[in-house]
Amino acid sequence: MGLYARHLAPWLVDCACGTKPIAYQRRKIIPRASGVVLEIGAGGGRNFALYDRGKVERVIALEPDAAMVNRGRARAPEGLPLEWLQRGAENAGVTDRSVDTIVTTYTLCTIPDAVGALAALRRALKPDGRLLFCEHGLAPDTEVTRWQRRIEPVWRPMAGGCHLTRDVEAMIAAAGWRIDEAERMYLPGTPRFAGYNVWGSARPG
C-alpha cells in the first residue's frame, strides 16, 4: 500500500465526508438509531456526536482502515459507549440477532461487494431491527449519469475506491431488504456527479 493510500486518501475522504451538506444529511438519519447500533464504515467518526444518548445503548463501529479508525477514535465524544471492530462489512463477525439498528452513511460506495455485505449483515439484526441508510450513488438524470460513468475510473483510485454509479436502492433490495421509506435529492453546493443522495430505512424482506 502506497503513501497516498495510507495517509492522503483517508484524509481526503474524511474531509469530503465532512462538508456542510453531508453533515445536514447525517442529522436526518443518525438521531433515529436506537439500542445496540452497528455502524458500517464508521470511518472518521463523523456520526458519533449525532447519536441520541438517551436511545443508544452502545455503538459497534465497523471500519477496516487503520488510518480511519485513528481518526474516529480522536473524534469519539466522551460518554458514548463505543466498540471498534477493525474489519470489513463482508466479514463483520457480529453475533446473530444482537443488533437493533444498522447504520450506513456514505459507505456502500466503497465496499467491494456491497450487496453481499448487506445480505450477510441481515443476520446481525434482532427480529424488529432496521437499517438506516444515507448514501450517494447513481443519478436518475441521463446527462449526470453519463458524466458519472466518465469520471468514475479516475475518481475511484483517488477517492478510496468510491463508486459513483451504484444504484443504492437497487443494491439494498437485491440484498434482501424491504425499503420502508426513501427520499432522494441532489445535495446543494455539491457537484451533481457526486451529489445524488438517497436516505431512509429498510427491514429484512
Label each PLM-derived region with a short phrase.
Residues A16-V36, R46-L50:
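Conserved alpha-helix/loop element of class I SAM-dependent methyltransferases that forms part
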Residues L38-I40, G44-A92:
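Class I SAM-dependent methyltransferase SAM/SAH-binding core
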Residues E90-I102:
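A short acidic, Gly/Pro-enriched loop at the edge of an enzyme's catalytic core
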Residues D100-A114:
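A short SAM/SAH-binding and catalytic strip from SAM-dependent methyltransferases
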Residues V115-P127:
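A short glycine-rich, Lys/Arg-flanked "PGG" loop and its adjoining helix->strand segment in the class I
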Residues D128-H136:
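Conserved beta-strand signature within the Rossmann-like core of class I S-adenosyl-L-methionine
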Residues G160-G176:
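Short alpha-helix
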Residues W177, R184-G205:
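Core SAM-dependent methyltransferase catalytic element
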